[in-house]
Amino acid sequence: MAIDAATVRKVARLARIATPEERLEPLAQELNGIMTWIEQLAEVDTDGCEPLTSVVAAGLPLREDVVTMGGDPARVTSNAPKSINNFFVVPKVVE
């Protein structure tokens, strides 16, 4: 798939990225290079390869969930800029 300046312009507009006209052609060349690399990756034979979520095959040890009374609320909120009745007070962000 070849990417031209018009495609870069369209993608930039959809992404709401201000792109000067003189940068469209260099960006198209860079994106074409990336697409070539992706096409090379698509040609790699991965049959028989187990999908990986990590290159290190290590898991985390599980522990039993234990219900506790929690920490000292006064001590936890002592560093807060503002707290009321041991609750953090934060600026309102939703009307």
UniProtKB/Swiss-Prot annotation:
GO terms for molecular function: asparaginyl-tRNA synthase (glutamine-hydrolyzing) activity; ATP binding; glutaminyl-tRNA synthase (glutamine-hydrolyzing) activity. It catalyses: L-glutamyl-tRNA(Gln) + L-glutamine + ATP + H2O = L-glutaminyl-tRNA(Gln) + L-glutamate + ADP + phosphate + H(+); L-aspartyl-tRNA(Asn) + L-glutamine + ATP + H2O = L-asparaginyl-tRNA(Asn) + L-glutamate + ADP + phosphate + 2 H(+). Pfam families: GatC (PF02686). Its EC number is 6.3.5.-. The keyword Protein biosynthesis applies. It is an enzyme of class 6 (ligase). Keywords: ATP-binding, Ligase, Nucleotide-binding, Protein biosynthesis. One of its GO terms (biological process) is regulation of translational fidelity. Belongs to the GatC family. NCBIfam families: gatC. Heterotrimer of A, B and C subunits. HAMAP family: GatC. Allows the formation of correctly charged Asn-tRNA(Asn) or Gln-tRNA(Gln) through the transamidation of misacylated Asp-tRNA(Asn) or Glu-tRNA(Gln) in organisms which lack either or both of asparaginyl-tRNA or glutaminyl-tRNA synthetases. The reaction takes place in the presence of glutamine and ATP through an activated phospho-Asp-tRNA(Asn) or phospho-Glu-tRNA(Gln). This is Aspartyl/glutamyl-tRNA(Asn/Gln) amidotransferase subunit C. It comes from Caulobacter vibrioides (strain NA1000 / CB15N).
